[in-house]
Structure formats: structure tokens, C-alpha cells
């Protein structure tokens, strides 16, 4: 086998590979003889079909099957010999004739080689959130609202009321697509509508019609409406007032709590503290990763981005429960590209740093992280034992321990400031971020 390495611009190169004719023809001949012993053909007993007839009828197909198996073996050997770190590969067949050498080109995209420096340029704003009894009471109030019952009332609309409305949205005096609806239930203050919409209904009565002016958020998904000033003609058809359940033993049983109200409040606070800790860690980590992407200079392999896009599509399909009849591959790649590029770049940067630093996940650290994570489950000890039996889950935990250590290492060198934030705003931002990332 002859191999010629041709270096190209950036992270690209090609391998021109030539396989001797006798090697290819020998394998093809053996496969034809093997096929002749098993194939059924009219006029011949099983195993007695002449190899010449098999070659005449199936020779081209057999040759292509042999080549399809042989090409990956040959370029894998060449890649190994040349000591190349390959991110992606495309094969181009050049010559394929009986009695002639097989020639093909393996166009390679390599993993970039780079060193990350300038950690002191990274700026991180560390959120500081105080969790007091006030936030705990508000959380319990939110849980009460989830179990609220509603009854019709004849008064003006107030916060927390459920109203049934018709509305017509207009931009520049013309109704816009998706801006008209009838018999829609809206809980005032829930934030289910765009900012300003629910506030505009407060004070209205049943049967009243009113036109309000609202401005769509700048980051609204419909670019035609993003940042646009619009009007909504609203008609109130029904007003219902919420009745919240009392916080008693019967109420707390809905959440699987057996120790009464005091136990319930303690568990709520512990859950809030646990959730807050992980969210704040993620917020800091996201800023660190963003900073790393800004200081690291390298070419991102397109093949890795494409692979990540395909994985994101499959993940979306899984979230949709397999959605019969829905071809996720019909979705445009650019819908996923930005997130995919970020993930690939972050992964490459972390790998680069870990290759130069010795971060290890000690068994005690993995155990401690696992103990913390399983507290969110109904049966922590049972969940813990199940996870410990899953090698993939343990590997993920080890990776998370190392990722946390790496983040702390970067933070020691970065410019870190603190910013006081509200608990519920932090939770809301986290939910929005998760939705944006599918």
C-alpha cells in the first residue's frame, strides 16, 4: 500500500492511498469462490455454480462490497501510521478497475492543536442569592396556587384571577399571524403572556372591551414581532377567583410528606437550597466556558459540529416521545448550529486544558457528589445503589468532578465580581435557558 500525505490549509489534509491490484483482486476472487459455494442459481445444484458465472453476474457487486470493507481498514492503518488525530473523514474513490491498483483519497479534518492562555482576561460575575424564610413562604404559596380551585365572580379583574378572553393582536393597524385567539384562559400575574399583556387586563369587567398597547421582547422568537409595538383588542368573557388550599397535613401529603407541616417546610427549604446551589454553579460555569471560548483561538472542525447537530436532533425527537410521522432530519441544521458549535468548542478547550493539567476525580469526591445529587429523589439510597451499578453514570459523575475542579482552577485566575440576585429570578432565567437549548 502506498500512502501520500498532502497537507492543506488549517486543520485539513488528504491521504492519497493506492492498494496493489493483486491484493484487491485476490480478495475479490476468494469472495466470488465463497459465494459460488452458497448461492442458488437455476440449472445448478447448490455449491456447484461455476465461479465464472458468479463473477459474470455478481462480480461487480462483490467487488464493491470488498472495497467498502477494505477502504476503512486501509485509511485507518494510514492514519495510525501518520499519527493523525482525525475529527472527520470523507472518502473519494479515484480508480477502481480489475487488474489495476485501487486508488482513493481520504479527505481528513483534524482535531485542532492549540494552547489556552490568558485566563486572567476572563470576567465572571458570581451571583449571590440569599435564601430566607420569605422565599420559602413564597415557594409554598406558589405550590398552593398549583392546587387552586376557581369559581366565577362578578367584579373587576385582579392579580391571580383566571380570566377567559378573546383578543386580536395588530401591528401597524393590521392583524398579525398568530395574534388572534378566542376563549383563552389566562391567570393574571402568571407571566404566560408577553410583558404588559396581563397587566392591561387588570381592572376590566366581564363583557368589557379594551385596546392595550404592548411591546414584544427584543429576543422574541418571531423576528417580525421582536421589539415591535403592537395593540391588542381584548374582550373579557369570564372572571374566576382563586381559592387556595390551606397548608395542613392533608395538603402536605400531596407531596409525599408524612411528617406534617414543619417537616414539609424544612424539605421545601432543603430542596430550594439544593436546586439553587446547582443553578448557581451552572451560571458560573457557563460564564467560565464562555470566557474560555473567547480567549481560545482555533479552527472548529465542521464534522464535529455536524455530529453534535445530529445528536441534538435525536435528543429533540426523544423529548417528543418519538413523535410518529415526524422526520427530525427535516429541521434545518442552522436551528441547532449555534448551540452545537458552543458545545464542540467547549469540549475541545476543556480537553486541551486537561491535557496540560492533572485533574483527577477521587473516589471520595465522586461519592460525595453522588450523595448530594440523590437527595433530590424520593428514595435516595435506592437511587444511589442503582447509579453505582451503572458504569456510564459513574463515568459521567467523574467527568463532572473534574469539570468542577477545572472551573475552580480557572476562577482562581479570572476576574471575579459578585452580584446580588433574587431567588425566583434566578430560577426563571434557568428555565428559560433550558428551553432555549431544547
UniProtKB/Swiss-Prot annotation:
InterPro entries: PPIase_dom_sf, PPIase_FKBP_dom, Trig_fac, Trigger_fac_C, Trigger_fac_C_sf, Trigger_fac_ribosome-bd_bac, Trigger_fac_ribosome-bd_sf, Trigger_fact/SurA_dom_sf. Its EC number is 5.2.1.8. It catalyses: [protein]-peptidylproline (omega=180) = [protein]-peptidylproline (omega=0). One of its GO terms (molecular function) is peptidyl-prolyl cis-trans isomerase activity. GO terms for cellular component: cytoplasm. It comes from the Bacteria. SUPFAM superfamilies: FKBP-like, Triger factor/SurA peptide-binding domain-like, Trigger factor ribosome-binding domain. Keywords: Cell cycle, Cell division, Chaperone, Cytoplasm, Isomerase, Rotamase. The keyword Isomerase applies. It is found in: Cytoplasm. Signal peptide: none annotated. GO terms for biological process: 'de novo' cotranslational protein folding; cell division; chaperone-mediated protein folding; protein transport; protein unfolding. It holds the Pfam family FKBP_C. Residues 160-245 form the PPIase FKBP-type domain. PANTHER family: TRIGGER FACTOR CHAPERONE AND PEPTIDYL-PROLYL CIS/TRANS ISOMERASE (PTHR30560), TRIGGER FACTOR-LIKE PROTEIN TIG, CHLOROPLASTIC (PTHR30560:SF3). Involved in protein export. Acts as a chaperone by maintaining the newly synthesized protein in an open conformation. Functions as a peptidyl-prolyl cis-trans isomerase. Consists of 3 domains; the N-terminus binds the ribosome, the middle domain has PPIase activity, while the C-terminus has intrinsic chaperone activity on its own. Belongs to the FKBP-type PPIase family. Tig subfamily. This is Trigger factor.
